[in-house]
Amino acid sequence: AGYVIFFIDKKNNTLWLDYIAIFKEHHSKGFGTRIFEAMKKEFFEFSGVWLEVEKPDENEPDTLRRRKFYKKLGARIVSENYIYPNNNGGLSMDLYFLPFCEENFAKKMHKCVKTAFETIHSDVENIEKIIDKIK
């Protein structure tokens, strides 16, 4: 139905979307949303994903559709003065950020609590049962 290419930035705990393509016959069927849901699930420890987005162009409806899609996912515009580097001096784009942590906060919190409890309170009996009660 499509594919995605992204860069894993472990140093900054984020992803960078390089390219996403959903074949035309699969547009508006939820495949793009499923790709991002899979990324969030796989990389839930990461803060989120950076999206380099073309400026809106009424003559190019796909640019408008992409922007609407990213906003629907929860992406926020971070910079309208972003320059995508290329050998022609750069391309003016907008930079969006789609946070993963808000949606996956409960999972992340549980993982952090588990690590802290197992380290700090390792002397407590049945620590696993206590951890499991925390939602």
Where are these regions (language model features)?
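Conserved beta-strand in the GNAT
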Residues: 1-8, 14-21
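Conserved acetyl-CoA-binding loop-helix of GNAT-fold acetyltransferases
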Residues: 22, 28-42
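C-terminal "cap" of GNAT-fold acetyltransferases
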Residues: 63, 82-134
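Conserved catalytic-core motifs of GNAT/GCN5-like acyltransferases
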Residues: 52, 65-90
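Conserved N-terminal glycine/acidic-rich loop preference
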Residues: 13-18, 58-75, 113
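Conserved GNAT acetyl-CoA-binding A-motif
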Residues: 41-61, 65
